[in-house]
Amino acid sequence: MASIPCTFQLSARASSASAAAAARRSPRAAARLGWLRPSRLSAVVPASESGRVGPTCFFKFGNKDAEGAGIYGSQGRDDFDRDDVEQYFNYMGMLAVEGTYDKMEALLNQDIHPVDILLMLAASEGDKPKLEELLRAGAKYDVKDVDGRTALDRAADDTREFILGFAATLAA
């Protein structure tokens, strides 16, 4: 998973009289906690410049979008593994419905790549954003499970049309 550098600036308005009183009551704590020190960031971009007071976060992606920055949609087939299958199985509530990991383990014990298993699970759930991500990563919708069913067989009609349409868009 990609990490994003982020800087937070918290500013609070206080009168100089109340800050001075706090410093007199506990000068060591005031110095240690930086109560009387202005933020180094506030000299560059004060929070009040935007017209609001509160946290401000600066993300530096340059000229890249989320995909180019490696956050979403930049994974390939081999970037998915068994742990991703288990996490998706749990996240989508399939364990709660099934009651056991048997269905997931049966798929993982076959000679099927984890990204293709994820595509089957996402197709059965109708999870279009996940389907899009997996198809971009190179998942194959014609891989068969132990019952001979593909992701298309598991999908509802609208999801099936989405898979075929999106795959055609990627092929073009």
Swiss-Prot record:
User: What Gene3D superfamilies does its record include?
Assistant: Ankyrin repeat-containing domain
Q: Where in the cell is it found?
A: Plastid, Chloroplast
Q: Where is the transit peptide?
A: 1-28
| Alphabetical keyword list | ANK repeat, Chloroplast, Plastid, Protein transport, Transit peptide, Transport
Q: Name one GO cellular component term.
A: chloroplast stroma
Name of protein: Protein LHCP TRANSLOCATION DEFECT
- Keyword Chloroplast attached: yes
The family database entries (PROSITE patterns) matched by this protein are listed as: ANK_REP_REGION
Organism of origin: Oryza sativa subsp. indica
